[in-house]
Amino acid sequence: QRSSAASDVYKRQVLEALNININFEPKDIERQINENNFGFMFAPNYHSAMKFVGPTRKKIGKRTIFNMIGPLSSPALVKRQVVGVFENKLLKIFANALNNLDIKFAWIVNSEDGLDEISPYAKTNVIQLKDNKISEITIDPKELNINADKFENIIGNDAKFNADKLINIFKGEDNDFSKAVCLNAAAGLIVSEKYDDFKLAYNHSRDFINSG
């Protein structure tokens, strides 16, 4: 199975390659979110338990229970989430767990080509948790007129390569990277209740990026 979700370490390296400081106090992150609608929380800086298990997880080199605990134990106590899982059978398990944590609105996603996010190449199975109610959704890129080429096109590389790709996305470059980003950004717009129609949310993401 494939997992396209980079670890927090890889995300950190990309942001550092862009000369973006990630070492902020919680109050600074709160201010950034209020001012810019965006904040990056590097997990080891805020979640002491995960900080100490990180080296052990790296040595094991395989998926463990910690791959599932992470999204369920966020110290930020957010009420809206988009969560990717690495197996389809985990969708409802996560939905029930998040419901027990009083999450208001969440999408739990797993694509049929093995990604733990919404795929531009294959259908993605989604369990929606909203106000204690669980429902099933399928996202089909063909219905969105997405003509993505092949999975290998979104495989990352070193931090500089990934940072350059990220910059190109924000410059409006139309490729499989940007399609994947817009699909998953659309999920964020849904759980934040900016949109209730996924196609409209996706088109908004595309228009926003294309506008520069």
Briefly describe each language-model feature range.
Residues 1-6, 10:
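Single conserved hydrophobic/aromatic residue that forms the stacking wall/gate
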Residues 16-23, 28-212:
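Glycine-rich anion-binding loops and their surrounding alpha/beta cores
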Residues 13:
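N-terminal glycine-rich flavin-associated loop
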